[in-house]
Amino acid sequence: MQDIQLDTLLSEDVTPENASQVMQALSQSLNEHNIRYYVDDAPSITDSEYDRLMQRLLKLEALYPHLIVADSPTQRVGGLALAKFDQITHLKPMLSLDNAFDEADFSAFHKRVTDKVGEVSFCCEPKLDGLAVSILYRHGVLERAATRGDGSVGEDITENVKTIKSIPLKLRGNDFPELVEVRGEAFMPKAAFEALNDRARAKDEKLFVNPRNAAAGSLRQLDSKITAARSLAFYAYALGVVEPDSHPLAKTHFEQLQQLKSWGLPVSSEIKVCAELSQVYDYYKDILTRRSDLAFEIDGVVMKVNDIDQQQRLGFVAKSPRWAIAYKFPAQEEMTLLEGVDFQVGRTGAVTPVARLKPVFVGGVTVSNATLHNANEIARLGIKVGDTVIIRRAGDVIPQIVAIVPERRPETATDIVFPHNCPVCGSLVERLEGEAVARCSGGLFCEAQRKEAIKHFASRKALDIDGMGDKVVEQLIDKELVQSPADLFKLTASMMTMLDRMGMKSATNLAAAIEAAKTTTLARFLYALGIREVGEATAANLAAHFASLDALRVATVEQLTEVEDVGAVVAQHVAHFFAQPHNLEVIDALIAAGVHWPAIEAPSAEAQPLKGQTWVLTGTLNQLNRNDAKAQLQALGAKVAGSVSKNTDCLVAGEAAGSKLAKAQELGVKVMDEDELLALLAANA
């Protein structure tokens, strides 16, 4: 914006006729000075001058409240408290990153990348230890903000995000897309964290453990006034959805970050492009060395393939991009005493040794337990009860024993012996050839497996039995009302009133939820069975490929490996699961209890004339929703990609097609307009 003289803004006479114009000018000036201070690091007025502008705007808004504009900087102080957070479905998933913990991990990642796309350069940036946030701007105005949540659905934290001073309520300039999603990290600077805990200490209140917890807790306040007082900050690290997709964007990740900065969004000054692998390692070491001197907490660095076209060619796996990795810093380490070992039995029957430690403060938390994983890990460490051990928080999250201190071993140290029988049900503990993990052979007869298996079966992503929480499942099993998943469907409301804090109304609601859960999908049912390494994505692929449970039950390992993203190991797990008679008994009992799903029609070869072809959509389609077009093309067997390459079979070009059309013409890719697409779809309807 054009600079407006400070004296003019502070002295201009205000009347009802010009109040709106003056207030807008003050808001624009204050917002511009915010960007210069937080983003450009080049303030052009003093703090006292900024305060005088703010006070003048506050006084005018008090006189003319009906003229307050949405992007006024005064609106950052927080509004009315919410009763709860609304849910927001992300326009596209907010994926997590794979981790590298050493040079070997990163080298393997680098090889996977270069094997697929050739030489690359990386955009390297600090991995902030905060909370991932999506911010949506429409016509340059902040419309909504959400947490990452489970990656697909997050919580609406718009009012809280508006209180973060470094986030512009309105983008700078006018060269941004009509709709732009900005993704980044909200965090609490170290100084703000220390001040927050100092205030809490003075009031004898509970202290926050670390800045990340403080940031997460602050952003999830129902009262945005509390968030406003917490001095949060934000750095943008990526573009999300952009509409229209024909809007010109930079061709590298680094340049896109500079675009975000030009629009007024804060971007870390520690970002660097590294063309050589040695430069990547040097960057990692440099940031690690300066970690304690930075104004914010980090737990590693993020390496992203810089070229956007190469990113698109690399694509994604189920939960993370193939073109980026988080190179984690070594966790903080401490020494403590191994006082004993307990053995826990998990949902799949895995018997896991858990170290009981003399409590020690490490990585911001007090640690008293750590997994020892399996017998192989115990042998590798050469560990005994009574040893002094070195504990660290792997990835700053999971406590891990990394070594023992042999010279401190007492004469009374004793070997760690795996139990021959399950510590929960007494069944034989088996360790199959080639597997590191020992397992209880008790299956669903084992109470530990039964509880975890039924919790999983009823969970939101499985059969989604509303109200069937962990404590309810534990009571149902403890009171011997349920011994297998099928028993859930035999429960009545009167039976469930036997549970603690379960009145007839709650029991009736839960009974209705159980009845409703009988109607599900094959994909959810497969996921609910708890087959090893079969997550949501794999369950969906299995359901789509085989179309029926009967076909899947008799599938061979070879047939299973034909399913998308199912390798030999997962195929063996699935085949072994359906080969076990007690698993089939459970499935048959569930079907007999009324669990069902709509039939899936397996597409015939005739119905998929585009099978094996790669199509791309670009530009604006006037007669057909883009998602509908994509779904109909996929139903005909096509793979719908996001970018044009030499492997593209056809580009559907709507209005304002832009660079993708030019690239398709350059590569000689077939181009089809919307009318031709509609004719094709109609012919194959």
Swiss-Prot record:
Cited CDD domains: BRCT_DNA_ligase_like (cd17748), LIGANc (cd00114)
Enzyme class: ligase
Keyword check for DNA damage: yes
One GO process term, biological-process aspect: DNA repair
Binding residues annotated for NAD(+), in chain numbering: D47, S48, E49, Y50, D51, S96, L97, E125, R148, E185, K304, K328
Cofactor(s) demanded: Mg(2+); Mn(2+)
Catalysed reactions, as listed in the record: NAD(+) + (deoxyribonucleotide)n-3'-hydroxyl + 5'-phospho-(deoxyribonucleotide)m = (deoxyribonucleotide)n+m + AMP + beta-nicotinamide D-nucleotide
Active site as annotated: K127 (n6-amp-lysine intermediate)
Keywords: DNA damage, DNA repair, DNA replication, Ligase, Magnesium, Manganese, Metal-binding, NAD, Zinc
Residues annotated to bind Zn(2+): C422, C425, C440, C446
Membrane-spanning intervals of the chain: none
EC code: 6.5.1.2
Single GO cellular component term: cytosol
Gene Ontology molecular function: any one: DNA binding
Gene3D superfamilies assigned: 5' to 3' exonuclease, C-terminal subdomain (1.10.150.20), 6.20.10.30, BRCT domain (3.40.50.10190), DNA ligase/mRNA capping enzyme (3.30.470.30), Helix hairpin bin (1.10.287.610), Nucleic acid-binding proteins (2.40.50.140)
Disulphide bonds in the chain: none
Residues of the BRCT domain: 605-685
Family annotation (NCBIfam families): dnlj, PRK07956.1
Protein family: Belongs to the NAD-dependent DNA ligase family. LigA subfamily.
The protein's role, per its UniProt record: DNA ligase that catalyzes the formation of phosphodiester linkages between 5'-phosphoryl and 3'-hydroxyl groups in double-stranded DNA using NAD as a coenzyme and as the energy source for the reaction. It is essential for DNA replication and repair of damaged DNA.
Name of the protein in question: DNA ligase
Species lineage: Bacteria, Pseudomonadati, Pseudomonadota, Gammaproteobacteria, Alteromonadales
